[in-house]
Swiss-Prot record:
Domain of life of the source: Bacteria
Location of this chain's protein in the cell: Cytoplasm
Start and end residues of each stretch annotated as NMP: 30-59
Functional summary from the UniProt entry: Catalyzes the reversible transfer of the terminal phosphate group between ATP and AMP. Plays an important role in cellular energy homeostasis and in adenine nucleotide metabolism.
Gene transcribed to yield this protein: adk
PANTHER family: NUCLEOTIDE KINASE
Protein name per the record: Adenylate kinase
Organism placement in taxonomy: Bacteria, Pseudomonadati, Chlorobiota, Chlorobiia, Chlorobiales
Length: 218
């Protein structure tokens, strides 16, 4: 089974991706990992991508798609794979379709912007140990300090409200149109299109996991 998992940053894709990957015994494929591996192995595509990146440019969809085709033909992908962060744009989704790369299921984890902002901007971290807290959902015993060492907790720059809002804006402009694309494709062509499911991402990790697996096993 080949699965695409969509959702805004902070929607909980990473956690659910691990569950899916383990349950179906399929690898989680990220374009970033593929690029790094190809560059490290100095494959022809890796060298081509490195040259583009060294020039300070973005790697083209054409190169990304070639990497994807190479990766899904490797032995560990015979049972399928889970795409993580791909496709990112309508152009990439359309290219996948034109290449006749079969996708069985597209799952969107849908969480309201304000809930994502609350989730992410409430995170606090103890840098030395990596212990993570949340001001609402998992607060430290004493506000602003680590339970064990008593040292101060920090808010990572990535988790500030301003940064989260910017990341959400990029997602809604660039990646969210994929949701309409896959939904409309399924409506027009039930036989060829991947099954599309939108899952509400509010609730416990287990509740969301159950909803996703109900759709995948339907």
């Amino acid at each position: 089974m080949r699965i695409i998992l969509l959702g805004a940053p902070g929607a909980g894709k990473g956690t659910q991706a691990q569950f899916i990957s383990t349950a179906f015994n399929i690898p989680q494929i990220s374009t970033g990992d593929m690029l790094r591996a190809a560059i490290q192995a100095q494959t022809p595509l890796g060298l081509e991508a490195k040259k583009v990146m060294d020039d300070g440019k973005l790697v083209s969809d054409e190169i990304i798609l070639k990497l994807v085709k190479e990766r899904i033909n490797e032995p560990d992908c015979q049972q399928g794979c889970l795409f993580d962060g791909f496709p990112r744009t309508l152009a990439q989704a359309e290219a996948l379709r034109q290449e006749n790369i079969t996708i069985n299921h597209v799952i969107e984890i849908d969480v309201d912007n304000e809930e994502i902002i609350q989730r992410m901007s409430g995170r606090r971290v103890h840098l030395a140990s990596g212990r993570t807290y949340h001001v609402i959902f998992n607060p430290p015993k004493k506000e602003g300090v680590d339970d064990i060492t008593g040292e101060p907790l920090i808010q990572r720059e990535d988790d500030t409200e301003e940064t989260v809002r910017k990341r959400l804006e990029i997602y809604h402009n660039q990646t969210a149109p994929l949701i309409d694309y896959y939904r409309e494709w399924e409506e027009k062509d039930l036989l060829q299109a991947p099954k599309f499911s939108s899952i509400k991402g509010s609730g416990s990790v287990e509740e969301i996991r159950e909803k996703i697996f109900t759709e995948l096993n339907a």
